[in-house]
Amino acid sequence: MILNTEQSMVQEMMRNYAQNQLKPTAAHRDKTHEFPAQELKDLGALGAMGMTVPDEWGGAGMDYVSLVLAIEEIAAGDGAISTIVSVQNSLICGITLAYGSEQQKQTYLPKFASGEWLGCFCLTEPHVGSDASAILCKAERDGDHWVLNGVKQFITSGKNAQVALVFAVTDKQAGKKGISCFLVPTNTQGYLVTRIEDKMGQHASDTATITFEDCRIPLENLVGQEGEGYKIALSNLAAGRIGIAAQSVGMARAAFDAAVQYANERKAFGVELVQHQAVGFRLADMATQIEAAHQLVLHAATLKDAGLPCLKEASMAKLFASTMAERVCSDAIQIHGGYGYVSDFPVERIYRDVRVSQIYEGASDIQRLVIAREVAQV
């Protein structure tokens, strides 16, 4: 795919910022678990926190191809930050734009798009991951308020977000059609951060357990219509999966670049590693896999921009890119030898960061199920 002028400018701008500002400090954030508050403000100023939000709502008004290019470049600098940016764009801004009332758009979108307010997506629960229809968190009417009770788990930015998009059961008898979506300011009484996960990677991105204890919000905080929550959640997961695929490509590319640099500097048997055919062949395979995944991502994003169905293509991109990224990062470690296993070199961190891409926003086997159902249709 040949990028247009605007897309190329976005790619170059984000690459410059990520390589100069995010990459040099990524290891520090990984070790200290420091939340990237300033970096997110910077990205907001660059338009990266609401890229597809129209100008009238304070966004950059760009296409989805530009968004995935930005996510890929950010991920090449710091995978943890790219997760926050992907969720903010694909899920938080995407849902508010598509389903929010005019008042909700006026109140929330400009602050989401600028990065002033960070959002978190509260769908997963302790016993519910892939089967979103089985959530237990409930919301009950009480006068002019909804009262939320329940627990959400593995919530990206759950501690640091200003607003949560929460999915809860409003009609237990209605099954999938009894789930609704709500905007919940995180400073609301009854919104409790009860656990911060100690994760394998992506340490700069907090992942929290959120407990709702008689959390009262106004009736007007309902997003869309009552009972639309399941549809809302699933309608934007395809977009989210393209974003995760893009970040997988970015992290794989970072590991590949580190491997190329190391292979050109390190000598074995009197010559640089890159001169050994085994290493050269490994690099060739890595480069081919990265490019294939990159093109899958762009294809899915192009379909989305055209308003065409992209469920299958989004799942293909996420499945292939996330699997590819782990393999490429593993190969990058192998090229580094023992140095690849220690934190002095970035490939150890990138490998830990990339592993979750096969789990969140739909595990790999869920993507296979989606693809199988789509290709089996006659």
Where are these regions (language model features)?
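Flexible, small-/acidic-enriched active-site or ligand-binding loops
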Residues: 134, 189-218
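Conserved hydrophobic/aromatic beta-strand scaffold that supports enzyme active sites
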Residues: 120, 134-138, 145, 163-167, ...
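Alpha-helical interface subdomain recognition
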Residues: 1-87, 99-104, 111-116, 131-132, ...
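A short, Trp-centered hydrophobic/proline-enriched beta-strand micro-motif
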Residues: 115-123
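Short Gly/Pro-enriched turn/cap motifs at secondary-structure boundaries
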Residues: 112, 127-130, 154-157, 171-173, ...
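A short, charged helix-loop
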Residues: 210-232
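Short Ser/Thr-interspersed hydrophobic loop/turn segments at strand-loop and sheet-helix junctions
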Residues: 47, 71-75, 168, 184-189, ...
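A short core secondary-structure module
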Residues: 145, 149-193
